[in-house]
């Protein structure tokens, strides 16, 4: 037995030797040292996050009075700046991705503007911001050592200064004559002329507000150095009322615009004085900027969705609510499912519209109560991306939008508001008979090689003031490009009809807005006498 074990041991050693030796010498295998419970090696570092592309903001700056593009406007956002070209267009392409950025618009002779964008946090995000700017209403020079009133002709707006009340930033007295620039801001005619986004600073963030009129005032000395009120002094401002509300409150808070935060900040109050139509809100201020007679309002939410012409939900669409019975705006973006929830003033009338860079939706009017409400169907972006908005002042009380369609018998107005689903593929949202508007006409489709006509009728038949003095305003949005029309010369007591423009289409249904700008005693007639319009899908 022992001999067998000995032979087996020799065989085992021979087999090991045949396998080769190690560091312990020929014929032997070096076993690894025993493990001492060493920790496992660390995992490899995670890959770097993908580099985000810069955001882009583009748009057009227009003159708020005539809709023409404004060149040489400096546009600044997040440390990036650009200058508008000849037609007012601009593009900022190197904006770091952010939740939102504040855009500032400035040019000599124009009232400064400002607007916060929607979210730009995604890589390569982009948005379109079109902004109207008001020309300065009155510029005058005076001796700052004497008391002085800066009066705006044709308006109740005014700034009253006491003697020797202005100072340079270093506290010194101004050199030479003082130059004042004062401009009333009337948001009831165009809510977009107001700087900012109708948001006031509030505890915990911001709150929506409505405006009853605003005033921009700035002062410089002979060297062009900006001036403001000296410490311990004040000035009186009078703000011309401008509101879509049927009743002006006897007293409202005063807010000034913070150009750093993009929010309105409450400081003081103003009381309603004078006799209509020459009323004004009067208050006392301790510094100059844009001052607004405002109030924060309680809100409810309008819930809904946005879809394209094919019925697919649209994410990232901008949805805005605009007051019809109050002067204010609110906006939001649709989520990944194309859903939105936007604020409106409680117990009010407002309309809601969705836009993308090149499309616009229908604009339903909503009567809000004290509870959140849901729209009956999705807002539908139209392929034509064309809409017309009519606004006006308190008088005449009733102006009417009229659109002549692609076929001879198509007339969209208060008695036949049209349809977006069937011909004429044009719809008027509502007939506003109580001043201000807005009335919005939306085009779902356009026909090939046709001429559409748009005109405004003074249904009230009153001319003190008429459409010119009201003033009436027509804004056309054509695939993101905006054109604004104000009444031309030539209105008289017999010219109820303002033929504003025609829309001409080509074989591909591309639309061109052709100004007409004529007051007429009789309504325009359709240029298309057939009924066989061919629509583009």
Report the location of each language-model feature:
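Bacterial Sec-dependent N-terminal signal peptides
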Residues: 13-54
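A short, solvent-exposed loop/turn motif at the edges and junctions
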Residues: 96-123, 132-134, 347-370
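Intrinsic-disorder/low-complexity signal
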Residues: 379-537
């Amino acid at each position: 037995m022992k001999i067998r074990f000995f032979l087996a041991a020799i065989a085992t050693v021979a087999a090991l030797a045949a396998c080769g030796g190690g560091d312990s010498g020929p014929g032997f295998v070096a076993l690894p040292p025993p493990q001492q419970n060493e920790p496992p090696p660390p995992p490899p570092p995670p890959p770097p996050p993908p580099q985000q592309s810069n955001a882009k903001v583009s748009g057009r700056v227009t003159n708020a009075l005539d809709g023409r593009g404004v060149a040489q406007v400096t546009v600044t956002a997040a440390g990036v700046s650009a200058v508008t070209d000849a037609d007012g267009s601009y593009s900022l392409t190197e904006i770091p991705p952010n939740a939102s950025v504040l855009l500032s618009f400035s040019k000599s002779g124009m009232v400064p503007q400002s607007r916060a964008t929607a979210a730009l946090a995604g890589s390569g995000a982009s948005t379109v911001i079109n902004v109207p700017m008001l020309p300065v209403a009155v510029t005058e020079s005076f001796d700052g050592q004497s008391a002085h009133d800066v009066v705006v002709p044709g308006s109740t707006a005014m700034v009253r200064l006491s003697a020797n009340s202005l100072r340079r930033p270093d506290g010194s007295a101004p050199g030479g004559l003082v130059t004042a620039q004062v401009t009333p801001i009337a948001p009831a005619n165009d809510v977009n002329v107001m700087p900012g986004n109708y948001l006031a600073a509030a505890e915990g963030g911001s709150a929506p507000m409505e405006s009853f009129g605003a005033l921009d005032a700035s002062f410089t000395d002979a060297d062009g150095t900006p001036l403001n009120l000296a410490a311990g002094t004040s000035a009186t401002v009078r703000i011309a009322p401008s509101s879509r509300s049927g009743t002006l409150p006897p007293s409202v808070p005063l807010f000034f615009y913070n150009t750093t935060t993009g929010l309105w900040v409450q400081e003081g109050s103003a009381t309603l004085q004078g006799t209509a139509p020459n009323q004004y809100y009067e208050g006392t201020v301790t510094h100059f900027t844009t001052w607004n007679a405002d109030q924060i309002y309680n809100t409810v939410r309008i819930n809904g969705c946005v879809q394209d012409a094919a019925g697919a939900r649209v994410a990232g669409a901008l949805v805005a609510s605009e007051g019809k019975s109050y002067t204010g705006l609110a906006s939001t973006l649709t989520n990944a499912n194309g859903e939105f929830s936007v604020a409106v003033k409680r117990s009010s009338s407002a309309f809601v519209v969705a836009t993308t860079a090149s499309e616009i939706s229908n604009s339903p009017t909503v009567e809000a109560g004290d509870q959140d409400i849901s729209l009956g169907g999705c807002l539908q972006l139209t392929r034509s991306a064309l809409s017309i908005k009519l606004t006006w002042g308190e008088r005449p009380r009733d102006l009417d939008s009229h659109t002549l369609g692609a076929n001879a018998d198509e007339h969209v107005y208060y008695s036949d508001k049209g349809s977006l689903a069937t011909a004429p593929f044009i719809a008027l949202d509502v007939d506003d008979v109580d001043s201000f508007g807005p009335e919005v006409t939306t085009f779902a489709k356009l026909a090939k090689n046709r001429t559409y006509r748009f005109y405004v009728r003074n249904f009230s038949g009153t001319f003190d003031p008429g459409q010119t003095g009201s003033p009436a305003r027509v804004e056309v949005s054509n695939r993101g490009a905006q054109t604004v029309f104000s009444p031309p010369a030539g209105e008289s007591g017999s010219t109820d009809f303002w033929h504003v423009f025609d829309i001409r289409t080509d074989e591909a249904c591309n639309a061109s807005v052709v100004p007409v700008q004529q007051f007429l005693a009789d309504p325009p007639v359709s240029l298309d006498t057939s009924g066989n319009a061919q629509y583009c899908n």
